């Protein structure tokens, strides 16, 4: 049985975790990866002394799968200060720790984003979600997050000034139409742990998963054209025959029969600039509330981890949810907006690179924490893994990798 030809399509988090689980059972899978390194959407480039993550990403230390698969001390995680810097109407102020200790948030600062009743409700919600299991969260009726916040009684002030800009950056959509299941899950994770990045960039996370593999082979620069039956056709024309195929990437890219079965994925544009020094000077996310900005959120990455810049300049990560501007115009518009909120002249923000991330998060109507492993099986030979089966998070990507591996192992038991 152990000489079975098992191919995994995609070396993202789900593909790597699937390989880890298959190796534990004695198999030696082969991963076909279209790019030149592991990580899928979680990648880091080294450019001119800067570490550029593909999109602003963090790891939440409370994620269950993070505890299962990652050695957090070895990643030398650098944590964000909880809360946010709010840039509003030519002014800025700090809201510290609203998701964990809302009652401790200093009155004056909080009064600018919400009412005293909001503070009490935030505290109540934090306590409720700490006690609520992840399973119970994902069994709740699915309502849009914005509706949920209104139903809970939060004021328009705190929804506009904090919840919208903060969760837009997480959900990558402007109107908070994402299921409140996801809101509760993320809120719970923030209240139980920290948002962090590995000292040397997000790429360190898939690298650590890869280091747990010993008999798995990874073929880089090997994009798959299509999968039919037990045959995998690569873009270079090579055909591979497989006993089992784990599709740990968006399946409609490689399986013609699944075209049109998935909604349009969420997109984001991530721009990087260097500046003589950070105007925030703290490891915190900066939010721009309101609907009249191009920029949604900003972070000086070297305020969080100094290794992100080996120069004498600061590295600014800027997230833009949507824009039709050509890159040159977009860069100029972002620089002008940065000047408005910081007082630093636009030309001092030196543009480094932009990442147009077309498949940042899956579009999902029905968010789940898990699924029966039988749902990972498409045919006797083809199995699916990936966050698009559950919810848009690195936790879900790793969960689905474990589930699809279990489904494959089950297919080898005599009763299946």
Summary of predicted features, one role per range:
Residues 44, 67-88, 155-161, 265, ...:
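A short alpha-helix-loop-beta-strand transition element characteristic
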Residues 307-416:
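Conserved flavin/dinucleotide-binding core of flavoenzymes
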Residues 13-14, 38, 400:
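Hydrophobic/small residue at the entry helix of a nucleotide-binding pocket
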Residues 124-226:
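Active-site/ligand-binding neighborhood in enzyme catalytic cores
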Residues 23-47:
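Glycine-rich FAD pyrophosphate-binding loop
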Residues 4-31, 409:
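N-terminal Rossmann-like FAD-binding beta1-loop-alpha1 element of flavoenzymes
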Residues 225-332, 340-341:
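Mid-domain catalytic core of redox enzymes
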Residues 48-128, 132-136, 145:
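Dinucleotide-binding Rossmann-like beta1-alpha1 core, especially the glycine-rich loop
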């Amino acid at each position: 049985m152990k000489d079975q030809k098992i191919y995994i399509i995609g070396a993202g988090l789900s593909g790597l975790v699937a390989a880890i689980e298959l190796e534990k059972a004695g198999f030696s899978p082969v991963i076909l990866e279209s790019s030149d390194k592991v990580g899928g959407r979680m990648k880091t480039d080294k450019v001119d002394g800067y570490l550029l993550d593909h999109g602003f990403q963090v790891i939440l230390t409370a994620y269950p799968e993070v505890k299962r698969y990652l050695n957090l001390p070895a990643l030398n995680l650098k944590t964000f200060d909880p809360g946010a810097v709010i840039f509003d109407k030519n002014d800025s102020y700090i809201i510290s720790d609203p998701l964990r200790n809302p009652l401790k948030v200093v009155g004056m600062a909080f009064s600018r984003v919400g009412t005293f009743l909001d503070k009490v409700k935030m505290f109540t919600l934090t306590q409720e979600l700490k006690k609520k299991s992840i399973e119970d969260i994902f069994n709740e009726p699915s309502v849009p997050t914005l509706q949920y916040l209104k139903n809970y009684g939060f004021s328009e002030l705190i929804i506009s000034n904090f919840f919208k800009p903060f969760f837009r950056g997480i959900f990558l959509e402007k109107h908070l139409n994402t299921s409140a299941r996801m809101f509760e899950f993320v809120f719970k994770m923030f209240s139980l742990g920290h948002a962090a990045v590995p000292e040397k960039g997000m790429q360190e996370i898939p690298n650590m998963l890869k280091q747990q593999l010993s008999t798995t082979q990874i073929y880089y620069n090997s994009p798959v054209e299509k999968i039919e039956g037990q045959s995998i056709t690569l873009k270079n024309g090579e055909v591979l025959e497989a006993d089992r195929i784990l599709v740990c990437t968006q399946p409609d890219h490689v399986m013609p029969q699944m075209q049109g079965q998935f909604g349009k994925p969420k997109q984001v544009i991530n721009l990087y600039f260097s500046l003589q020094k950070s105007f925030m000077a703290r490891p915190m996310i900066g939010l721009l509330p309101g609907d009249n900005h191009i920029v949604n959120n900003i972070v000086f990455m070297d305020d969080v981890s100094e290794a992100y810049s080996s120069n004498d300049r600061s590295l600014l990560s800027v997230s833009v949810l949507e824009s039709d501007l050509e890159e040159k115009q977009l860069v100029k518009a972002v620089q002008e907006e940065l000047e408005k909120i910081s007082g630093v002249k636009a030309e001092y923000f030196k543009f480094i690179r932009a990442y147009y991330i077309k498949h940042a998060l899956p579009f999902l109507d029905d968010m789940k924490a898990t699924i029966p492993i039988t749902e990972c099986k498409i045919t006797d030979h083809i199995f699916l893994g990936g966050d698009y089966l559950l919810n848009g998070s690195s936790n879900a990507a790793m969960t689905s990798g474990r589930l699809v591996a279990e489904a494959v192992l089950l297919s080898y038991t005599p009763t299946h």
